[in-house]
């Protein structure tokens, strides 16, 4: 009955330590909302504007001569919801006998800043961009995750022969992750129709992750007792059983009779059970993890823009940024468990930002109305992530974008657009500690030209996510359903001198 106790011990450590990927918004989900112009119309890949310092840097060369400065502020609110089914949840004190439980994480990013600047002179455009192309906030699961509770529930289930009938626990997980991007580059206007761009982006990543299981209780015939006391009582019971068997073996040996195989097997089983219980003693007071990570990476960016008639075409390629996050962690010793070693103190972990290809087209239908189209591809499988998790994907991420702008007056422009995001996910890749799901997004907003030198901007962007359902086993049913929500509000100001 207790031969799998070591697996439970491994699962406890693995589940807790793997939480460090929860709040990561980089990975295969790269932030592209780097300006208010994107919020109000995400199809900016061939648009001519200051926000092009990020989305279409070659096209910035076609802006008027002078200094251009854009300042953007965004507020983002996300929820991440996992509905988990597991028969061991029915043993939970707070679950009312239900095998299904909802775990919700709330992620708030109250301030996502970005700055775009360009100085155009003659055929040259010198550009700078500061943004948060990955992460951007913190995510908190106040009740932990299903992978946390399933571990405790499985332990309670395995301890039933020793009198356990249920469990209680408190779980908690929080992750905070930011990738700050600093981009410098130059565009050159080859002709009135063609421009090219080359630049570098430096990414500085910083993250903090906390995971906790506390107040673990075991239900018995006498009521709930703390996990440590239960283990001590169980160990006392096992010691008594082992002593009785040893006494029986001694009697056989004293009589010169062979010891029955059943007796030695019972002793081996009880001793193995005791050893497994001893391995769980370290969790009698719960589990705490604290891990800080940081790293720096640099990658080149190239772009091109071509105009003809009422059309503008553009493309941009961002090379892969190699990121090796260095840990400062409460995990100090090496372990046979890979998930533990991922967060070992002073270890460096691969967390590359994948390469990206963006292409776009803009059509000036009239002098006042513009139609925008775009396509993004992220080369996720060519990135290097810890334990080669990129190999669990079926392919890279694809995004399809469309939008329209209308100059109602010389001062007021309104716009709207949509973005369709498709990941190539697999059940093996998905888990409740780090997940994305397919989605479509809608954005709208306006520009108001307050003067010849000042333009005010506002936009709203909402993402609607699908559900991803994963069934681990059918008998008994162990499954998860993943989904999210995302809403972003932003304001900005653009100055031209």
Label the predicted regions.
Residues 20-132, 136-138, 435, 461:
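N-terminal, post-signal peptide beta-strand-biased segments of exported outer-membrane/organellar beta-barrel
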Residues 2-25:
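Gram-negative bacterial Sec-dependent N-terminal signal peptides
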Residues 4-8, 89, 184, 495:
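Intrinsic disorder/low-complexity segments enriched in polar/small residues
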Residues 26-39, 43, 47-48, 112, ...:
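Outer-membrane beta-barrel porins/channels
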Residues 18-19, 68, 195, 469:
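Hydrophobic alpha-helical membrane context
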Residues 15-22, 92-94, 189, 305, ...:
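Short stretches within intrinsically disordered, low-complexity N-terminal or propeptide regions
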